[in-house]
Curated annotation (Swiss-Prot):
InterPro entries: QueA (IPR003699), QueA_dom1 (IPR042118), QueA_dom2 (IPR042119), QueA_sf (IPR036100)
Catalytic activity: 7-aminomethyl-7-carbaguanosine(34) in tRNA + S-adenosyl-L-methionine = epoxyqueuosine(34) in tRNA + adenine + L-methionine + 2 H(+)
Region (Disordered): 1-22
Organism of provenance: Psychrobacter sp. (strain PRwf-1)
Subunit structure: Monomer.
Family statement drawn from the similarity comment of this UniProt entry: Belongs to the QueA family.
Protein name, UniProt field: S-adenosylmethionine:tRNA ribosyltransferase-isomerase
A cellular-component GO term for this protein: cytoplasm
Amino acid sequence: MTQPLSQDQHDSSSNMPTDNAETQGYLSVADYDYDLPDEYIARYPLAERSASRLMYLPAQKENTAVIQDRQFSDLPELLQAGDLIVFNDTKVMKARLFGQKDTGGKVEVLVERLTDDTEFTTDESGQSFDNVALCHVRASKAPKLGQRLVLGDGNIECVMIGRHENLFILSFKNPILPDLEQYGELPIPPYFERHADETDNVRYQTVFHDPTKLASVAAPTASLHFDDKVLKQLADKGINTAYVTLHVGAGTFAPVKTDNLLNHTMHSEYANLPQATADLINQTHQNGNKVIAIGTTVTRVLETAYQKTADEHGHISTWSGDTDIFIYPGFKFGVIDKLLTNFHLPKSTLLMLVSAFAGKANIEQAYEHAVAQKYRFFSYGDAMLLERNL
């Protein structure tokens, strides 16, 4: 499966909140730092997906955080019949490969995105290549143009045919996805400080992923808490579900390297909002019910679609393309009413996003509470249910 990096009919979203970028000259990244004891990082999943804890922050004004400590299994009682939950149905590729350059030096490759865009499949001489992917490459010396890499215990061959920004353009000898599934390793987050194992192959995927949408290098982690039991309880209560797609890139783990977050360049990811999901969202709001985004990836898809397609009534329609939307305090949300998410890394764009949604001071208080109460953090950690700041 290929996803275009860019096509004429596929817009890229705005990288800045349109309502506040011109009025704020400096926002300090240091304001989104916090101290976290290492032992609170969840490096392995719990025995059951829905056994996590759930911190609930009802809608409230800034700096008035009211915090409820719940269990994730309580989620159905915190929502109402007629509400709509929106999931990301992407699947994580076994995108990490290890091997050698033809010179013998060790190399690690992370496949970021498969592409059939001629911008990347044709070199400067006009020669065309098959099975092309944009990849991150780690090696003592970067591979040179035309250099061959042998990966996956000698079972995968590719050649470096170009560069695109910080990515290497590699052409593989054989179709990429089957080889990744057989010889690749699931690219679990770097803060796990370990290699992926058989447990990760199951638990770092959602139970509802679409197997045809095998294109992410990280999981939509808020969705990892859902098991069949919770999904049935939600359905039995009359809570509706819908799906969008965002193929998560390695940029989700990229640190903000500027002191002023307004100078940060957001990574771009392919996203798709189907018309059926847009219709359900519009109908839900028309009925006076709430739209709940399951994770920051869903939030980015829906708010991008709102910027691109909303009419005078706030109704959205189908949209697909690359989104580099950067959500931070001051952003005006147009679609989501509630957000289910995990606890995020210090100084991360995801922490800035939840601060925009629930209020920066409220999130600070919530994270202080989470540390004090020994919540589990990050991808395999506990969850928060946030309601939009009043």
